[in-house]
Swiss-Prot record:
Homotetramer. Disulfide bonds: none annotated. It catalyses: alpha-D-glucose 1-phosphate + ATP + H(+) = ADP-alpha-D-glucose + diphosphate. Pathway: Glycan biosynthesis; glycogen biosynthesis. This is Glucose-1-phosphate adenylyltransferase. SUPFAM superfamilies: Nucleotide-diphospho-sugar transferases, Trimeric LpxA-like enzymes. NCBIfam families: glgC, PRK05293.1. Its EC number is 2.7.7.27. Alpha-D-glucose 1-phosphate binds at residues 101, 166, 181-182, 192. It comes from the Bacteria. Involved in the biosynthesis of ADP-glucose, a building block required for the elongation reactions to produce glycogen. Catalyzes the reaction between ATP and alpha-D-glucose 1-phosphate (G1P) to produce pyrophosphate and ADP-Glc. It comes from Bacillus cereus (strain ATCC 10987 / NRS 248). InterPro entries: ADP-Glc_PPase, ADP_Glu_pyroP_CS, GlgC_bac, GlmU/GlgC-like_hexapep, NTP_transferase_dom, Nucleotide-diphossugar_trans, Trimer_LpxA-like_sf. One of its GO terms (biological process) is glycogen biosynthetic process.
Amino acid sequence: MAQKQKCVAMLLAGGKGSRLSALTKNLAKPAVPFGGKYRIIDFTLSNCANSGIETVGILTQYQPLELHNYIGIGNAWDLDRVSGGVTVLPPYAESSGVKWYTGTASAIYQNLNYLSQYEPEYVLILSGDHIYKMDYSKMLDYHIEKEADVSISVIEVPWDEASRFGIMNTNEEMEIVEFEEKPQFPRSNLASMGIYIFNWAILKEYLEMDARNPESSNDFGKDVLPLLLDEGKKLMAYPFEGYWKDVGTVKSLWEANMDLLRDETSLNLNDRNWRIYSVNPNEPPQYIAEKAKVEESLINEGCVIEGDVKHSVLFQGVTVEEGSMVIDSVVMPGAKIGKNVVIERAIVGSEMVIEDGTIIRPEKNVDDVVLIAEGK
């Protein structure tokens, strides 16, 4: 029997991320590079480490190899523990055959045995594909204080975007009275962040109930949470007011990277009290040539800059040759940009080679973002 844990986290990291197009052709969405040196999953794992959550199950499925290699034993996030720590949980074969995760609830249900060994009081369920910094221990304190069966972290979103999210309708005490999954006409703009805290006994009971229902899609938002409400369980909304970004599209991923370059951003990566940890790429120092010009940009290790870079994010090992300009763009690891190239409002994928004289910018709508990646 493993050492008993008060709270165990389950991190859903098996998403395909099809709206990210070629960026996720051979890569799980949580492993997509972000912010010059990170992967998207670094934010959730760092939040766990900084919040004192020492046991994290990571549920993977789509294109898991690079993500598994990146996570390793969790030492980058101080989650390599004798008891607990990080455990990668892909789908596995039973006597009846391999069971793929068919939904968010299905993924947790198939790993109830993993949770049971820790006898937790509470289970924290997380998504591995959002950019944010959050102290989960404060949410747990709130959950306990409110004597909730389930607590759901919520954030106010613009009304014109509310139909893209699971929306919570609450009373004055922030108790959830109705949950609507992507409503056409939302009555609230409190959106679910995909962060849940369940009392362990409630989670186990309702996942087993959901698994027995042949009509269920095995999804928390569509099936489990509405059932809990119908049966009178106490669901509380936990309001979050910090930076949070769903980076599920090429444009939203680009926007989140650009947010890092603002003078006053609520996503501060320089906060030594809440570090975002990542795997060290072990690259040499970046080199900026005499005639190069760099403004308002994040330039990571191993970059060689001979041209101009303005308001852009460059990952490790990027080369920008003489006469080239990179403006308002994200250039992912190992990309090579030749001479006299112009790149504007674009994401350049990992290891891409941009030939001399190429011009890359939105052709029709100046507000668009161009993606240049393998498979495009």
